[in-house]
Amino acid sequence: MEALTTGIAFGESPRWGRDARLWFADWGVREIAAVDLEGRLESVVELPSASFQAICFDWLPDGRLLIVSSREGRLLRMGPDGSLATHADLNGGAEPAWNEIVVDGRGHAYVNNTAFDFASGDEFAPGAIALVTPDGSAREVAEGLAFPNGMAVTPDNRTLICAESYARRLTAFDIAEDGELSSRRVWADLGDGVPDGICVDAEGAGWYGDVPNRRCVRVREGGEVLQTVELELGCFACMLGGPDRRTLFMVVQEWLGPERMADGGRGGRILSMPAPAPGAGWP
């Protein structure tokens, strides 16, 4: 296992880019950065915010970057000149607490909402998933989720998997041609696992980061654990990338509790190791 980069304030939302770099959000400094396999780091997007902010992102099939502006309840789209425009207004579907995003191969963007601000100690409320179609219209397509977190879409575009952190499970939905979700079911009951960011591989297995248990876990549909990577720090998200997508990247840092999310200094890092199967699907 190697450290690809260090000095991250609060890393999240890793994505393997078309430019052969690992992109990730650093919530603590309100930016999206990219790092190549030699560890060369570049700040790609700086968001105009004066305080700690949740940032998640993904790309449309044509390469345009979408960024979730959680506080404003908007899905932003970055233009060729780096300017940001509103791609969709998300607040018609739920109150601001927007979290993760995944875009499938058809250009359907799924954005989930925790429905409460756990960092402020708000009382739990069930969350939801909104669908943003390629034309920028948004509507709710799933509800009643126990802290929806990382999401992934299988390579056939037929299944969306969502981590329910508070329910300790991965939940799956069928995806219709128009992006609607149906046939909700438990994809994997994780026992004591607490899933955060997730990704899927070409053998049909899923990886999930686990913050309180300080590990990254590969699991099969049905819940069988295939591999556990024990870590010294909490794993907030994971991504399969590299030239053949056979490298597992893990975003890790010390977890100080929800009330101290902005107080972690620069102790975050991204670790990498070989994976048993290449990445597949989205992200």
Where are these regions (language model features)?
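Short loop/turn segments immediately following beta-strands, especially the blade-tip
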Residues: 173-180, 275-280
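A short helix->beta-strand "capping" segment at the edge of beta-propeller domains
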Residues: 1-8, 37, 184, 273-276, ...
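Blade-level signature of beta-propeller repeat domains, shared across WD40, Kelch, NHL, RCC1
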Residues: 239-283
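A short beta-strand motif characteristic of beta-propeller blades
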Residues: 1-5, 40-47, 84-91, 137-143, ...
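A short loop-to-beta-strand structural motif that recurs across blades of beta-propeller domains
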Residues: 31-33, 74-76, 127-130, 169-171, ...
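Beta-rich, blade/repeat-based domains predominating
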Residues: 5-21, 48-69, 92-109, 115-116, ...
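Short, solvent-exposed loop/turn segments at conserved positions within beta-propeller repeat blades
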Residues: 27-28, 70-71, 116-126, 165-168, ...
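Loop/turn-rich, solvent-exposed surfaces of beta-rich toroidal or solenoidal domains
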Residues: 168-169, 173, 184, 188-221
